[in-house]
Amino acid sequence: MALPADPDCYWVEPDRLLAGEYPRAFVESTARARLRALLDCGIRTFVDLTQAREPLAPYESLLISEAEERALTVSYHRHPIRDADIPSDAGMREILATIRASIERGDPVYVHCWGGIGRTGTVVGCWLVETGRAGDDVFEAIKALRAGTMKRRTQSPETSDQADFILDWPSRPSD
């Protein structure tokens, strides 16, 4: 499926896992257009990595409204991670389990944080590790996947802690 023009995003796995920035805009009509674009490209599960206290307008009710107008069933899951930080190991396992279960049901996923770079890149990196990538190949893959985005020049993930989390992911012990 084609990418929506807005929000800025990229397919991690075509027609299965899309990653990018927060889909809500300050102007409601723009927010609705963004959500419609995501629904129109097949997204049925939204994984929100932002915290409720971040200065972002919520979009869950708009999403449900847009989905109902199209007779679509969608799901919204918030797995909050502090901005520029990493999740707990258990938190990452929950995020990846949500993504995996949705894909297995045939429901394409949109995973996002605020800018679609740090927290999102961390989740994408761990997903790539779990699906067979290793070491620096993960970061090259993320860079290649993001090549068509507006924010492609910004490193993803953003912090060394996030990169280390990905590199350590396959050997991380359970909490």
List each language-model region with its residue ranges.
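Cys-dependent protein tyrosine phosphatase-like superfamily
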Residues: 1-110, 115, 122-175
